[in-house]
Each structure stands twice: as C-alpha cells, then as structure tokens.
Amino acid sequence: MSGVRAVRISIESACEKQVQEVGLDGTETYLQPLSMSQNLARLAQRIDFSQGSGSEEEEAAGAEGDAQDWAGAGSSADQDDEEGLVKFQPSLWPWDSVRNNLRSALTEMCVLYDVLSIVRDKKFMTLDPVSQDALPPKQNPQTLQLISKKKSLAGAAQILLKGAERLTKSVTENQENKLQRDFNSELLRLRQHWKLRKVGDKILGDLSYRSAGSLFPHHGTFEVIKNTDIDLDKKIPEDYCPLDVQIPSDLEGSAYIRVSIQKQAPDIGDLGTVNLFKRPLPKSKPGSPHWQTKLEAAQNVLLCKEIFAQLSREAVQIKSQIPHIVVKNQIISQPFPSLQLSISLCHSSNDKKSPKSATEKQSPEDHLYVLEHNLHLLIREFHKQTLSSIMMPHPASAPFGHKRMRLSGPQAFDKNEINSIQSSEGLLEKIIKQAKHIFLRSRTAATIDSLASRIEDPQIQAHWSNINDVYESSVKVLITSQGYEQICKSIQLQLNIGVEQIRVVHRDGRVITLSHEGQELQDFLLSQMSQHQVHAVQQLAKVMGWQVLSFSNHVGLGPVESIGNASAITVASPNGDYAISVRNGPESGSKIMVQFPRNQCKDLPKSDVLQDSKWNHLRGPFKEVQWNKMEGRNFVYKMELLMSALSPCLL
C-alpha cells in the first residue's frame, strides 16, 4: 500500500445548510442561513470593548522582545516559536480597526473641545500674537485687550466697506448695460422676431408674407444698420438703441384699408386720390424697442398694398352687370342700385405735408371696421389656400400633384365638374357679399327701429341673435300690446337676413321672401301690425266669453288698401243681444261698429210687415263708435272696456 500513489479526494458537504433535526420518517429539517444584517449583528456581539487595542498589545510585545534579547539563546528560540504561532493565529475581533479609529477620533474630539474651551474662557489661557519688541514693564494687560479689539473692529469694517464698494459698482454697471445695450444683443432680439440673413457685409431682413403663402411681388426687404448718430462720451438718452433698421421708402409711415358704403354715387369725374387718414401713427409699447414698432407698421403697409392690389386685379377681371371702377387708390362698386361701395387705400407717410392735406379733405367717418377686419382675414385664408394647394398623395405611393390629377382614372370627373370644384370666389366678390349683407342688416334694423318709435300701439320688439354668419343674420320680431302680452302672441316673425333677400318665417311655418328694398319690409310689417289688432280682438273675445261670428285676414269689401289688405272680425255678446264688428287696415286704420237690439233703437221706422213682438229681439243696424273718444291706453284695452259695457250683468 505504501508504494501506491496517493490520490487526492475532494470532500464537499452534501448540503450547505445545517440540519436542525431528523424526523422518524427520515426527513431532515434545515436551518435557514443568516441574512447579511443578522450575520453582522452576530459578529458585533462577539466584540469585547473592555480589552485594549492591538497597538498597545504590540507595544507590550515589543518591550518584552527587547527584554528577551538581553536574555540567553534558549529563551530567544522559545520566543521565535511563540511569534510564529502569533503570525498564523487569526484575529479574534474583526472590528478591531473600527474600534481603533473610533478611539482615535474620540481622542481628537476631546483635544478639540479642550482647545475651544480654553479659547472661549479667558480664565484658562489668553492667546496673543507673538510680538518681537519687548513690552514696556508698566503696560496694563487690559490695554492690550482694548488695542486688539480695535484692530479686529477696524479689519471687519474694512472688509464691509470693500464689499459695499463692489456691490455699488455692480449695480452701476448693470444700469449702464441697460442704457448702453450693445449691437449684438439687440441683433439677437431682432432675430427672435424677424427673418434675417447676411448678404456680403450687410444684414437683410424680410417683411413679406411669402413664408405664409403670399404671392405679392414686392420684395419687402429691410436692412439692419448700426446706430452711430450719438456721442457715447456724452449722456446717453434712455431711448437710445445701438441698432436701427432701414426700410424701403414706399413702406414708410402707416396705412389702412378704408371701406365705406354710400347711398349716393358721385360723378366719376370727381374721383381721385383718397387721403382720409385720421388714425394716429402707432405708438411704441412700453418696453418694446422702436425698431419693432417701425417694422410692424411697415409690414402692415405691405399687407394693405397686397390686399388692394388683389382687389384691383379682381375688379378688372370680374365681369359684372355694373362694371367696377378702379381709379388710383380707390375701387368703386355698386352692390345695389343707388348704393356705392368704396374701398380705398389710405397711406400716410412721415412727411410734414401729409397731415395738412389730411385735415383739408376730412369727411364724416363712415368707415366700416368690420369689413376692414374681414379683408385681413380673407387675405390670410387666401395665403393658407396657396400653401395647401399641393396636397399629400393618398395613398402614399402615389406621385405628388394636385388632387384633381390624382382623381383621374375610371371614375374621373369631366371638365365641367372639375371647374365647378375648382371655382372659388375671389376676394372682391366675398367682400361685396359681406357689404351687401351688412347694408341689408342695417337697413332692416333701421326700419324696425323707425316703426317702433313711430307707432306706439301695437308695440314691436326685435331680438337679434348673437350667433350670426358673415353672410346671414337672424332677428325675431314680436308684435304685442301693452298689458296683454300673454293673450296676444299670434304674430311672431323670424327674419333671416341674407345677402340680397330676406326670408320671413311665420309662426305657422309659412315662408315669405322679401327683396332688399326697405319699403317692402316696412309695408309687410305694417300689414302684420294691422292683423295683430284683429287677432287680439279674437283672443280677447275668447277670454271675455263672446262668440266669434266671422273672421278674415283679407277682406274683399270696403276701400282698397294701398299696403296689404284689411282684416275684419265680428263678435257677439254671450246673450246674443249685441254684436261688434272691427275692420282694421294698414293705411285706413281701425273702424269699430256696434249692433244694438231693435227694442233699443228709437230711430227705426215702424214696419207694417213685422207686427209680431218677437221680431223686436233681433239686432238692428250697426252704429259706428267714436273710437278716438274712448278711454284706454291702447286698442285692446278700449275693446275690453267696450265688451265689458255690452256684456250682461250676471248678478
């Protein structure tokens, strides 16, 4: 067996976990391994802080070694054996280094505490700088303390003064920087609002709306220059700016589009250059640079010129029954007969002569700001259409191009259908339609207001809708009598005001179309007010218990009305003794007749045919009532008094 070569066998435990117990059936119960925190707590429990540090033990061991060096050789051999055992002996306390560091830190903290207590409490020790010169023998220690305090206060005061000087310098420098803004910072602010590019040694900007879809040929270029008109050695004004812009001469000043509607058209020979500039020049906003206001005004002038150029081009191209007239900076159109629409470009430059000419030719302000605002909206919509004319292909694999080109194929449109799809109204046509609608709406409102102020009975009320369109508005017209609003609700009209006509919708759904003439609307409203009186008598008769014998909105008897037709109604009392006949016309007015019983008529001649007394209960002829002498605030109130007087007493 001794000659057999040794074989190394690695023995490993079958289970790393310790076995707690083994059951009768052979099952083993294991102990769960300790977690990191539990293992750390177990090791900390083994530390004995009562023992000395390792450094002290080493020093003691070193002293013993020195003592043993003086001993014999036998003792030195034993010592080497013991040192060998110590070298291979593992450390029993793994946290010895932590304990040593904590003890050294505690020692240093104690020393620091002692030093601070000595410095704070002068009873222990006084710290003074070392002086080279010997102190005089008669100098008092209190004098030295006073001198040291003065020196320390002087040093602190010097530090505070230096800090105050630095703060004042920084504040003054910031104020000077605000006043003396450099060219580069202003150029950076300018680039944040406007498009700039460098061409050679010049910096050019763009005022046009080409990026928004404008096709106006004006270049709209301005140049950025450095302001050198001020002497920097002198006092700099507050509004000084080192940057200035130079715009084209035709874009200087301010401009706006003046749109007005006049009833009488002047002679064509009197038309000329319109100079009706009344608006003040735009003022710069507080905090904004002057070049911003200057560029905004120039861009507004460019936009107004583009609008007027587009309108002039369309005025020449559009074929209408009454041709449009373009004279210098004015466009004349006639939307309705005896009505003139004037669109003028008013441009005021910064010359001194322009205010004088403006004051000489001032006229009453009839400018329609709504149409001017709509012109700006329309030109922006035109720009948007120009940008979106090239649409993305659907599907994505199709080539780029216009939509009508992609629709060609088996289901392609013919030429007429494509023209109908592509046909769109121009800027001038849209603004003329809006002007027609505005004029028709104002004429309708004036007609209703004039009737309401002129006629007190019946009352006419107009409720305008807040939600309108640029081409259509609606107003609800109510005709009522004062004090009888609950029973007199028969006349309710809805007026839909369009571009060239007015649609009237009655309460029962009937629709009547009126033209743009104001007299036609006035006649219609007068006839409706006349019918209202008859309808009010009908509703009052139902409330009073009278019987309606006849009713007609269009009476064919009597005088012919020049406006509409007359209405009539006949009602009888509850017992049938009395009858009231009412005839009301838009022009002739109201006529009321009362029929009495025969036995109350003294003027009737005796008849030889009607001898029986029963015929006396029949009603006699009608007698007209002097309506002007009746008491009452309105027509319905007078009619109520008349019916009450003729009704039988039930007591």
From Swiss-Prot:
Residues 62-74 have a biased composition (Low complexity). It is found in: Nucleus. Residues 51-83 are annotated as: Disordered. GO terms for molecular function: nuclear thyroid hormone receptor binding; transcription coactivator activity; transcription coregulator activity. Keywords: Activator, Nucleus, Transcription, Transcription regulation. It comes from the Eukaryota. Transmembrane segments: none annotated. One of its GO terms (cellular component) is core mediator complex. Pfam families: Med17. GO terms for biological process: positive regulation of transcription initiation by RNA polymerase II; regulation of transcription by RNA polymerase II; somatic stem cell population maintenance. The keyword Cell membrane does not apply. Component of the Mediator complex, which is composed of MED1, MED4, MED6, MED7, MED8, MED9, MED10, MED11, MED12, MED13, MED13L, MED14, MED15, MED16, MED17, MED18, MED19, MED20, MED21, MED22, MED23, MED24, MED25, MED26, MED27, MED29, MED30, MED31, CCNC, CDK8 and CDC2L6/CDK11. The MED12, MED13, CCNC and CDK8 subunits form a distinct module termed the CDK8 module. Mediator containing the CDK8 module is less active than Mediator lacking this module in supporting transcriptional activation. Belongs to the Mediator complex subunit 17 family. Component of the Mediator complex, a coactivator involved in the regulated transcription of nearly all RNA polymerase II-dependent genes. Mediator functions as a bridge to convey information from gene-specific regulatory proteins to the basal RNA polymerase II transcription machinery. Mediator is recruited to promoters by direct interactions with regulatory proteins and serves as a scaffold for the assembly of a functional preinitiation complex with RNA polymerase II and the general transcription factors. This is Mediator of RNA polymerase II transcription subunit 17. It comes from Bos taurus.
